Amino acid sequence: MKPSEIARVLTENLKLEKYKPCGVCFSDNKPENALEIKKKGNGCVVPMILKASTGVAFVVSEESTGWPCSAFYLGFQDHIFDGIEYFLSNKDDFFRPCEKFIQNPELAKSLINNINPVKPDKKYIVIKPLEDFNESEKPESVLFFVNADQLSALSFLMHYDAPEKFDRIIAPFASSCMATITYPLKMAMNN
């Protein structure tokens, strides 16, 4: 199915009104008028991913990854920062307030050590509306934003042909860029 057809089917059937389904791909070319974070180490990529779903392409390169976490999760560097396991867990004497998302540093370290993000094989990761993909482009993964009712409908639909299956939907711990880019790319590359 062509990307534009995927976009049409998702938009019509899920009644997506506010945000457009987007595709994620790798490219050596930056789309015209694409948004890009100005420099490495400054800013979160997630608001830009949301902006892409309103119709404006967004690119990430090694020079424009935003925060160190994004650089790691998007495959542009092999290390986040020293002490990430404390930042994600419960160590109170870290240099900044901890997020306390994970019970302890050991569990957080285990998570980080097992992420293994997909390494981009081209200069850019491109996130743009599926309807803007040309005939020669193929999305590696698809992302779209939904409300709670739409998410519920998707959950039911995933079990339409096999209601006894319990492994069709996963919700692993993840930052927003991991959930929208890292994990879907890994799943796509493994299929």
Feature map (PLM): residue ranges:
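Acidic, serine/proline-rich low-complexity intrinsically disordered regions
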Residues: 3-191
